[in-house]
């Protein structure tokens, strides 16, 4: 018996709708397009056209599979990703549009690096993308959609892609042949880094398994029953892969290398904690189209590592939630800062953030940038800023030297360095915030007549810092009452109160940057 396109589509739409498929009409058309090999436009225009018995039989078989909740991508054997169709089957994760953010980030970083010295001489984005070659490692390539998209967009790039699944590797190789990139990709059967030589890479990228087993019951039937669990679920509350990458990645990165990873939308704080504790910087957290945290950009601290602890006592659930949801809004970046027109003050090592929050509250038209690697303190600032509706601040929970690289010269109206660790033992003094080289950098960041405030409750450290400033800095002391009088709007912090209770006297050095050329 023959049926028209309209009858077939209507019947399929009703059946798919009955089992809760979100877009039943569209999926019915996709299945029929796959069977007839005719464009959807043709199917919509020729609704009264009769289908052959063979076409109807083939369509019904595919529809039965979809009614059993098999993903449509597996049924038709392809899935679009980054404007290209990739071969997929039950051995690989189905590409998601959220993962395209990861590809965007890597391309953006390549463009940014090439722009540093070439953009003014180039005429097109294509020229920027082909200027310099890059070596990329992808961990857990699956279908190869990430690696192959990068190869297609970045012609001078070479990639090594690994996967633990032999069947997934076959799919990735088929896609590399489809897009004619086999000469620039090496696909290796490896469990993470195990089979790699000691090659160095510009970027390590991965969309690792990150779903905890406890979330399984909340997931769609078609995902649980059909997609490979090894590509979805991870131990350690979904964080196992991030720990493996954090532990091993440094030895495979070039000096300026980056790690770009997809994360679950509620995992930013937990993943950040893992990498911070392994000696990395969290450079940026990117959001997807639904404004969920989706991709994290990471770089090793190397010789510029911070000596402070990243975590004091364990983060509470509330603190983790604040770091996940609020920190990305207030995370310092060059992009956020470059168009800044307000007065700007930098506080280095803000501790629990009492001073930073108070200054921001009293001076709503001024931007305050806080640097602190201690995540409990960062979470405390986010908590109190939300309670008091304070938004005129940015946070940098990383090493000081990294933000100094991103701040333009002559951009700061003031710098606060309040009660930094004195590192009293001689062999530890190299860890102090102040040294000759960093002092020069700090004064260059200050505007002419900008202020630097230094405070310490350790008398020897205070006067050693003063001697260093007098010998190497272009500053004038603008306040002197035996250095006991703090700057305007100062509040006694918990640390300062502890010093008072211990009979230690806090001294404040208030300096003005003398007129000089930058």
From Swiss-Prot:
Residues covered by region (tRNA MTase): 305-518
Taxonomy, superkingdom: Bacteria
HemK: annotated segments: 1-300
Active site: 421
Ranges where the record places region RF MTase: 1-302
Pfam family, one: MTS
Catalytically driven reaction(s): L-glutaminyl-[peptide chain release factor] + S-adenosyl-L-methionine = N(5)-methyl-L-glutaminyl-[peptide chain release factor] + S-adenosyl-L-homocysteine + H(+); guanosine(46) in tRNA + S-adenosyl-L-methionine = N(7)-methylguanosine(46) in tRNA + S-adenosyl-L-homocysteine
Binding site for substrate: 207-210, 425, 457
Stretches for region tRNA (guanine-N(7)-)-methyltransferase: 301-518
Transmembrane segments: none
Family to which the UniProt record says this protein belongs: In the C-terminal section; belongs to the class I-like SAM-binding methyltransferase superfamily. TrmB family.
Protein name (Swiss-Prot/TrEMBL): Bifunctional methyltransferase
Organism of this sequence: Rickettsia prowazekii (strain Madrid E)
């Amino acid at each position: 018996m023959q049926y028209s396109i309209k009858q077939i589509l209507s019947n399929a739409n009703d059946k798919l709708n009955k089992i809760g498929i979100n877009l039943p009409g569209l999926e019915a058309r996709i299945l029929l397009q796959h069977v007839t090999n005719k464009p959807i436009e043709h199917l919509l225009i020729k609704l009264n056209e009769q289908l052959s018995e063979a076409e109807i039989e083939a369509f019904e078989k595919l529809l039965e599979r979809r009614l059993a909740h098999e993903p449509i991508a597996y049924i038709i054997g392809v899935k679009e990703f980054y404007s290209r169709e990739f071969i997929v089957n039950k051995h690989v994760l189905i590409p998601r549009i959220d993962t395209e953010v990861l590809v965007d980030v890597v391309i953006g970083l390549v463009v940014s690096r090439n722009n540093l010295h070439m953009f003014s001489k180039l005429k097109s984005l294509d020229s920027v993308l082909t200027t310099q070659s890059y070596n990329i490692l992808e961990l857990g390539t699956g279908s190869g959609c990430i690696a192959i998209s990068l190869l297609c967009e970045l012609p001078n790039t070479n990639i090594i892609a690994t996967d633990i699944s032999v069947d997934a590797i076959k799919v990735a190789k088929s896609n590399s042949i489809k897009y004619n990139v086999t000469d620039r990709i090496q696909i290796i059967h490896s469990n993470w880094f195990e089979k790699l030589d000691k090659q160095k890479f510009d970027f390590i990228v991965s969309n690792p398994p990150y779903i905890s087993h406890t979330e399984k019951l909340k997931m769609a039937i078609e995902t649980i029953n059909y997609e490979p669990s090894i590509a979805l679920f991870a131990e350690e509350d979904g964080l196992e892969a991030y720990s493996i990458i954090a532990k091993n990645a440094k030895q495979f990165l070039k000096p300026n290398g980056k790690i770009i990873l997809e994360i679950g939308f509620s995992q930013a704080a937990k993943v950040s904690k893992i990498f911070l504790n392994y000696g990395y910087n969290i450079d940026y957290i990117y959001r997807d189209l639904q404004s969920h945290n989706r991709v994290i950009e990471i770089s090793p601290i190397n010789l510029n590592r911070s000596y402070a602890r990243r975590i004091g006592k364990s983060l509470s659930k509330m603190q983790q939630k604040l770091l996940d949801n609020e920190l990305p809004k207030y995370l310092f970046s060059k992009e956020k800062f470059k168009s800044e027109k307000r007065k700007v003050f930098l506080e280095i090592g803000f501790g629990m953030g009492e001073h930073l929050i108070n200054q921001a509250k009293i001076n709503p038209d001024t931007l305050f940038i806080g640097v602190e690697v201690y995540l409990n303190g960062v979470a405390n600032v986010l908590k109190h800023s939300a309670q008091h509706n304070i938004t005129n601040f940015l946070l940098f929970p990383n090493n000081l030297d990294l933000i100094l690289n991103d701040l333009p010269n002559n951009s700061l109206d003031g710098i606060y360095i309040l009660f930094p660790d004195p590192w009293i033992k001689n062999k530890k003094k190299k860890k102090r915030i102040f040294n000759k080289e960093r002092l020069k950098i700090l004064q260059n960041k200050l505007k002419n007549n900008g202020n630097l405030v230094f405070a310490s409750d350790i008398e020897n450290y205070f006067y050693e810092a003063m001697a260093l400033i007098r010998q190497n800095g272009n500053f004038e002391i603008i306040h002197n009452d035996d250095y006991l009088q703090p700057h305007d709007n100062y509040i006694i912090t918990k640390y300062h109160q502890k010093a008072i209770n211990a009979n230690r006297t806090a001294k404040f050095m208030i300096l003005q940057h003398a007129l000089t050329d930058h």
